[in-house]
């Protein structure tokens, strides 16, 4: 069975996007990229909400013609990886390897298939829907040293879920990576 894993940047006060969805507060460096790349390497498919799909679709393909760099390598990975996009309104996507899903419950069948992990990028509303199904196995949270005061909450309205801290890492820029697994 595949694991369903959430990967998210979060402010200290629990927001994963600013008041207008902006991400300009996210602190990144090469060590964080390398750490996230280790998680990404376990993925057999990317999982997106429609909003995240549109954001990723508008950004990553634009880097494919740039000189080689970490971003270009990731853009190539994004281009080829199967992308499970959950949306009730999308009817099709012109992006490579997109598999549309209408209902969050479809993730349960996806988990039963063979392959590497299913990695949710961002998509807080989808994370909450999957939490309601008790479908998420792991959380990789990059907690940023900032208080946003308002914005898009990561766990707003999520159901009570026990977690166990599997590992943590402190980065030079003050970001703390927390890896949680389902608790007992």
Segments (PLM) and residue ranges:
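Enzymes that bind and transform nitrogen-containing heteroaromatic metabolites
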Residues: 1-184
């Amino acid at each position: 069975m595949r694991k369903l894993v959430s990967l998210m940047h979060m402010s200290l006060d629990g927001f994963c996007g600013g008041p207008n969805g902006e991400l300009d507060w996210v602190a990144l460096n090469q060590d964080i990229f390398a750490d996230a790349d280790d998680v990404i390497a376990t993925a057999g498919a990317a999982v997106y909400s429609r909003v995240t799909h549109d954001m990723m679709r508008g950004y990553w393909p634009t880097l494919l013609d740039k000189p080689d760099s970490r971003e270009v390598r990731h853009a190539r990975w994004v281009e080829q990886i199967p992308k499970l996009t959950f949306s009730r309104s999308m009817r099709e996507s012109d992006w490579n390897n997109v598999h549309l899903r209408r209902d969050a419950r479809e993730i349960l069948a996806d988990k039963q298939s063979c392959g590497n992990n299913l990695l949710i990028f961002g998509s807080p509303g989808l994370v909450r829907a999957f939490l309601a199904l008790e479908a998420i196995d792991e959380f990789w949270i990059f907690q940023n040293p900032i208080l946003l005061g308002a914005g898009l909450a990561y766990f707003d309205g999520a159901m009570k879920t026990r977690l166990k801290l599997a590992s943590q890492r402190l980065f030079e820029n003050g970001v703390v990576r927390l890896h949680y697994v389902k608790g007992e």
